[in-house]
């Protein structure tokens, strides 16, 4: 099924958190928090200002974004767990996700 969000909505797929810390400690599922990072799957056309002019969305499909712990509404589409949120719930876009930082 193809899903097209409306207005300033964004569909995000959560990216799983790391299974262990930088020091090598394995994090059990019982204490793991939901990841607040995800990949943008679909975006709406944008919101409208007071005059009715379309304001385009800043994020694009494929962007890796950070969002608040309680942001969005969880939905299941084609067996995939996804989040639908407003663009304003997104805190920022991760610029370079290919390089990993080393622990200090």
Curated annotation (Swiss-Prot):
GO biological process, one term: chaperone cofactor-dependent protein refolding
Alphabetically ordered keywords of this record: Chaperone, Cytoplasm
Subcellular location(s) of the protein: Cytoplasm
A cellular component annotation (GO) from this entry: cytoplasm
GO molecular function, one term: protein folding chaperone
UniProt xrefs under SUPFAM superfamilies: GroES-like
Domain of life: Bacteria
NCBIfam families: PRK00364.1-2, PRK00364.1-5, PRK00364.2-2, PRK00364.2-4
Quaternary structure note: Heptamer of 7 subunits arranged in a ring. Interacts with the chaperonin GroEL.
Function: Together with the chaperonin GroEL, plays an essential role in assisting protein folding. The GroEL-GroES system forms a nano-cage that allows encapsulation of the non-native substrate proteins and provides a physical environment optimized to promote and accelerate protein folding. GroES binds to the apical surface of the GroEL ring, thereby capping the opening of the GroEL channel.
Family indicated by similarity: Belongs to the GroES chaperonin family.
Protein name in UniProt: Co-chaperonin GroES 2
Organism: Bradyrhizobium diazoefficiens (strain JCM 10833 / BCRC 13528 / IAM 13628 / NBRC 14792 / USDA 110)
Lineage of producing organism: Bacteria, Pseudomonadati, Pseudomonadota, Alphaproteobacteria, Hyphomicrobiales
């Amino acid at each position: 099924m193809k899903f097209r969000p409306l207005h300033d909505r964004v569909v995000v797929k959560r990216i799983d958190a790391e299974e262990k810390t930088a020091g090598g400690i394995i994090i059990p599922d019982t204490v793991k928090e939901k990841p607040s990072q995800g990949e943008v799957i679909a975006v709406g056309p944008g919101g409208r200002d007071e005059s009715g002019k379309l304001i385009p969305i800043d994020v694009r499909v494929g962007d890796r974004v950070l969002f608040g712990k309680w942001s969005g509404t969880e939905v299941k589409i084609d067996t995939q767990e996804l989040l639908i949120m407003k663009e304003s719930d997104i805190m920022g876009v991760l610029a370079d996700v290919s390089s990993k930082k080393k622990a200090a």
